[in-house]
Each structure stands twice: as C-alpha cells, then as structure tokens.
Amino acid sequence: YIMSHIGGAFIFDFSQIFSDAGILAQRCVQAFDDKHFVVGTDDVYIHNGQTKQSVIDNVLKDELFNSIHSSYYDRTFVAPNYKDNEMWVCFASGVESNTGQADKAFVWNYRTNKWSKRDLPDVSHISWGIVDDSGTYTSSYDADSGSWDSDSTPWDFRGYNPTQSALLLAEPTGNKLHKIDSYQNNGTSYLA
C-alpha cells in the first residue's frame, strides 16, 4: 500500500500498489537508494512505489525459501549493510537452527546484483549504526611496559570512528556481540 497526503478531513489516502505481492514477516523490508528491498512470501524484490522487480533467480529463490525453518519464518528479517551496498536476508534455517534465531543469511549486493551466503551465530537482530567499542581499548601510556624504540602497541586511542556506521549483531541471551566487520562473536571468530 501507498499512503498519500490529500488534506481535508481524511488527511491521507491509502491505495494498493501491488496486488500480487506481500511481505513474509514484519521486518522483511529495508530502504535503499529511494527503493525498498522486500522479502515477499514467494519472491525477493525491489520496488520504487510504482514498479517492482525480482532480484533473485529461480534456483536461488527456491534454495532460500526451502532453507527457511517453517516454524520460525516470522523471525526472518532484512539487515541493511549500507557500507558494502548489501541487503542481508537473515533467517533460522530448517536444518541447523534449533533456537529459532537467524543462523544463515543470503546477502544481495545492490551495486553488483550478486548474491552470497554466510553463516550467523544465532542472532535475533542486526542493526546499522555507530558502534562505540572504545571500552575494549584500555591500554594507557603509563601502563605500557615496552621500550619506546621497540614498542608497537597502541595506547590512549579511539578504537572506533564516530563518523562511520557499522553492523552490530545481537543475540537473544543479552550478550553484546561485536561489530560485523570484526567477524567476532564475543571474541571468537565465527568464520573459522
């Protein structure tokens, strides 16, 4: 549906845009480049409010929808990774997930129109924003024991850039997870 300002007593008008498409779950849409990326009930598409276009071929589409756990399909969500021009379709897989949390992601790069896949460490949410991880860097000049000529360790520095956003994973148990750029889950690589 589209909402248009019309003024008067009703203020807004709602009109159906597409009669042949819907959304799989509440968090299955994200905006980018004046478009919306949508995981529908049987397709993955983008639209600009006027026209829609599928962005996944039939083979990969079948693999994606057959991989989503049927009991947890409503926990599927899309996470935007704007830094790398990506949209992540995150879901609980039918084979490996027994927690109901997202353990797989199909990743679409909207600049190259290429898809990739990755494993996730059972996350309930991925968010985009500025991540202050400066608390993990506690070395000070006074505490550094290395000699000036041989010491290459950092001290008293900001371990993040407050002007650059990144992805942050969250798990349902409440443990803080590191930035996605670090490929770490509580200090353990999840790529290994």
Q: Would you name each region that the model predicts?
A:
Residues 1-18:
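Surface-exposed extracellular loop regions of Gram-negative outer-membrane beta-barrel proteins
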Residues 20-35, 41-192:
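Beta-sheet repeat architectures centered on beta-propellers
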